[in-house]
Amino acid sequence: MSIFKILKIITLGGIICSCGNSSKPLMINFSIQSNIKKNIISNADTLKLSILNPNNKKVDSVAFSMNSRRISDNTPLKSIALGEKILKATVFFEDKREVALLKIIVVNSNTPKLYNYELVNTYPHDITSYTQGLEFYKGVLYESTGQYGESKLRALDYKNNTILKNIELSPGYFGEGLTLLKDKIYQLTWQEGRGLIYDVNSFESLGNFKYGQSKEGWGICNNGSQFYKTDGSENIWILNSETLEEENFIQAYTNKGKLTNLNELEWVEGKIYANRYQKNGVAVINPANGAIEAVIDFKDLKDKVRIHPGLDVLNGMA
């Protein structure tokens, strides 16, 4: 290395150190004070906010917001969606402005009800299928199966397990949940970042759609005007029924905390039914705020099916 290069590096380093030493520590004058305990509050409560001002600055005004939406310093939470929130206080003082932030969690006020089930009938099913999604549409059962190199889309006569239509997915796709709307089938892939669209009658491909912030596809259902999609977290993403773009999301919470690994979904009488991967229960979720209103216990259902080496976990609802 030449002397010029060494001097150049030393000089540049000196400038960086000099600039670094001249900077002053950021003064924090305000913080958010609330009636929240351990950053958790119930949606039955009223959020009460104020500002801590230890340096006795002359405050002109304070503007509060929750996830960028303006709120007052006395806000009932009954109409607020559950989950993690960022509180922001913008403080105007002495011709200046300073922002204080606080992360909180809004949980449900009620404990989920516990439901059991009644087995009313059984039907034959292909035990080699790694079922990911099921849905009835005009009397036909549609099934999406998983595993790389084995994923399929099928239409079935469920009473005798006759395959009416069947297509194999590309070996690079791991099939996940599916739903049907307006004579179209929407099938998710797991980690491939896109969903597949088919004509319900011919199974002809009608294109695909890309995921947004949700990086994986697990389960999907619809209410006739919107799609709801899971990604394995506590989030349920709300998709536009025409563009398939993610417009919003809700977070599934009980009175104690979030429920993760949300998987297959089904829309039933205004509620979202969601099973959890590797769990034996199905959560009944309020689509307006993410509240888990009930849990259906299916733990003994696994004992009622044929035991074989490929048996894995409960999955698929229709």
Question: Which stretches of residues belong to each language-model region?
Answer:
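C-terminal motif of bacterial Sec signal peptides marking the signal peptidase cleavage site
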Residues: 15-18
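Bacterial signal peptide processing site
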Residues: 20-23
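Conserved beta-strand positions in repeat-built beta-propeller and related beta-rich domains
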Residues: 143-147, 187-192, 229-233, 274-278
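Edge beta-strands of extracellular beta-sandwich domains
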Residues: 97-106
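Blade-loop segments of beta-propeller domains
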Residues: 161-198, 204-214
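Short loop/turn segments that connect beta-strands within beta-propeller blades
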Residues: 157-161, 199-203, 241-244, 286-290
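Beta-rich, blade/repeat-based domains predominating
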Residues: 127-138, 171-182, 212-224, 256-268, ...
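A short helix->beta-strand "capping" segment at the edge of beta-propeller domains
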Residues: 108-127, 158-164
